């Protein structure tokens, strides 16, 4: 659309004004600044991704996570640790990709900067030449106008002295008038020459301004397209990162689906079982019960030194003079 073209909307009625050109340059500078900001954003995001990836890698490799689990849950945890490791590697790789995209943005900015510099150099020269020629034309105009006023004064002096001045004075006035007329003619030619030169310079400047507008508009279209595509690509990379992460986590989910509570319980029992017979009940033992010395189940019978029976009563042997019993014992008091 014509109304959207730079060359049709950035003019000024003042021949010395650069307001339209300056407006375009300011917009291009802002665009370049925006590209630099996105470039810095990518670099900082890359640093964040790299740090996160390395921290996640250290977490996966150094921090224990269910290391004493067994059987199917152990295998699921091993898959989990491996996939977390893979996710960390993906984030580190993403950081490298983001730095590469930042480098491309930087190269694009520098390329446009060089292209703009050529056009700006031409426009700066055109502005200087236009301004200088305008000054010359205005100086020539002032000189021409002054010579015209001098001629008019000389003519008026001749008319005033027609009846009062002598012949010698009139001759001087006529010489001055002739000189002023010659000066007017010369200044008029110089003025016309500078005006013609100014017009040529103005046309050249206007042509260069149109070319510059076309170059700058093409650059701005290219910049917007490049910036948009770079942002689009960045989002695609982040989406791919999410998809890759989900695929890795899906491997963990599949491993968890194979996890069997029954198998893990059975595996633990088979590996760590200690026996299938529980201990017998502890029975009450009456101290005076004749069955209290009976051996409990699982134990062999034998003498219990802590619980002995009554001592045997010896038989009386009266014929043995050296033998006596307690009944024959008495205390002697002296």
Swiss-Prot record:
F-BAR domain ranges (all copies): 4-264
Region (Disordered), start-end ranges: 288-322
Record keywords: Coiled coil, Cytoplasm, Membrane, Phosphoprotein
CDD domains to which the protein is assigned, alphabetical: F-BAR_PSTPIP2
Keyword Transcription regulation: no
Signal peptide: none
Any one GO biological process: cytoskeleton organization
Main function: Binds to F-actin. May be involved in regulation of the actin cytoskeleton.
UniProt protein name: Proline-serine-threonine phosphatase-interacting protein 2
Organism: Mus musculus (Mouse)
Gene from which this protein is expressed: Pstpip2
